[in-house]
From Swiss-Prot:
GO terms for cellular component: centrosome; cytoplasm; dynactin complex; dynein complex; membrane; microtubule; vesicle. The gene is dctn2-b. Part of the dynactin complex that activates the molecular motor dynein for ultra-processive transport along microtubules. In the dynactin soulder domain, binds the ACTR1A filament and acts as a molecular ruler to determine the length. Modulates cytoplasmic dynein binding to an organelle, and plays a role in prometaphase chromosome alignment and spindle organization during mitosis. Involved in anchoring microtubules to centrosomes. It is a peripheral membrane protein. Keywords: Coiled coil, Cytoplasm, Cytoskeleton, Dynein, Membrane, Microtubule. Residues 184-194 have a biased composition (Basic and acidic residues). Belongs to the dynactin subunit 2 family. It comes from Xenopus laevis. This is Dynactin subunit 2-B. One of its GO terms (biological process) is mitotic spindle organization.
């Protein structure tokens, strides 16, 4: 029972459910608030373009080979992520370098080697034992190697679009050749004597190209394209389940043929429908039609003879059945009687079996009773003899007591 001192307090809602209210928001709504934007000048605001970042780091991967970020207790530093100024391809990508990428990689490595040699040469002190390859000689060799790379003048050979065209060297050379041919067409022909004097300054800038045509390669590529086309057609037929109609005369002989053979067969069949050959086809069809009519007549005659023979056999069978149908009721009656006789014999056999079983049970019980009777008679004889002995002993005692 409630305490009576709280009965008449103001603000109490009677006959209503209890409600407990707090000034705080629920836990799910407490984290939902608008973060105040920082407007301080000390904070640097960096605008990040996700598309540009994606384009920059697309097809890149982080090399996790030989990395160790664990704590160290020795003075040697652990190996973490390494970053460089320029990298063509990462290790383990399995992608072959293009000529442009290989050229830029070699040029960059030569520049790094030059910087390292210059740094070593500036910081090297005189030592008692000099190495066979001094920094000065190494710097000369690096400069010669760089000059050799620059002498390849790939950009001069392939034009200003080498960075783009070197991904496809054959296409770049073909475009360059077409450009020089157009330039040669528009250039005026020199005089006849100038060609005999020797190569002029203009001829030094020309590049000689040799074009080699391989018919076998063209045939092989064409056959490969046809095989690829047949493969795609087979996959398409398997996808749509295009089954050939064996009854269609246009598809006869096309099973298992390649595409070219199929086209040739269809072309030969189309050529047969020429106007010049339609008369011959019509004459052949008329002769075939006459032969078909003769065959139909002979077939009808043969079918009529077969029908007559079958009807004659059926009539003979009916005649035989008439003589057998007279005796059929008697046979049925005899079978019914025989069925009843078999049922009675089966019942009699069951009764005999039951009687034999009962007789065996009675004989067994008689044997048991005979044995029990013999045992009872034997026990009675023994008991009778014992009683007689007891009576004789009692008579003797009585006689002794009477004396």
């Amino acid at each position: 029972m409630a305490d009576p001192k709280y009965a008449d307090l103001p603000g109490i809602a009677r006959n209503e459910p209890d409600l407990y209210e707090t000034s705080d928001l629920p836990e799910d709504d407490q984290a939902e608030f608008d973060a105040e934007e920082l407007t301080s000048t000390s904070v640097e605001h960096i605008i990040v373009n996700p598309n540009a970042a994606y384009d920059k780091f697309k097809d890149k991967k982080v090399g996790t080979r030989c990395l160790d970020f664990s704590d160290r207790i020795t003075k040697s530093k652990r190996t973490g992520y390494e970053s460089g100024e320029y990298e063509i391809l990462g290790e383990g990508l399995g992608i072959k370098e293009t000529p442009q990428q290989k050229y830029q990689r070699l040029l960059h490595e030569v520049q790094e080697l030059t910087q390292e040699v210059e740094k070593t040469q500036s910081t090297l002190k005189e030592s008692a034992t000099e190495e066979k390859l001094t920094p000065v000689a190494l710097a000369k060799q690096v400069a010669a190697l760089k000059q050799q790379l620059v002498s390849t003048h790939l950009e001069k050979l392939l034009g200003p679009d080498a960075a783009i065209n070197l991904t496809d060297p054959d296409g770049a050379l073909a475009k360059r050749l077409l450009t020089q041919l157009d330039a040669a067409k528009t250039r005026k022909d020199p005089e006849g004597k100038s060609s005999a004097k020797g190569p002029g300054p203009d001829n030094e800038n020309l590049v000689t190209y040799e074009l080699h045509c391989r018919p076998e390669q063209n045939k092989f590529s064409q056959a490969a394209k046809m095989a690829e086309l047949e493969k795609r057609l087979g996959e398409l037929e398997a996808a749509v389940r295009c089954d050939q109609d064996t009854q269609n005369p246009l598809t006869v002989g096309l099973q298992g043929s390649c595409l070219m053979d199929t086209v040739e067969i269809l072309q030969a069949k189309v050529n047969l429908l020429d106007v010049a050959s339609l008369d011959q086809v019509e004459a052949r069809l008329q002769s075939v039609l006459g032969k078909m009519n003769e065959i139909a007549k002979h077939k009808a005659t043969i079918e009529d003879a077969d029908t007559e023979s079958k009807v004659h056999q059926l009539y003979e069978t009916v005649q035989k059945w008439d003589s057998m149908s007279i005796t059929l009721p008697q046979v049925v009656q005899r079978l019914l009687t025989l069925k009843q006789l078999h049922e009675q014999a089966m019942q009699f056999g069951q009764l005999l079996t039951h009687l034999d079983t009962t007789q065996q049970m009675i004989s067994n019980s008689l044997k048991d009773n005979t044995n029990a009777l013999a045992m009872v008679q034997k026990a009675m004889k023994e008991n009778l003899a014992t009683v007689e002995d007891n009576f004789s002993s009692i008579d003797g005692r009585i006689k002794k007591l009477s004396k």
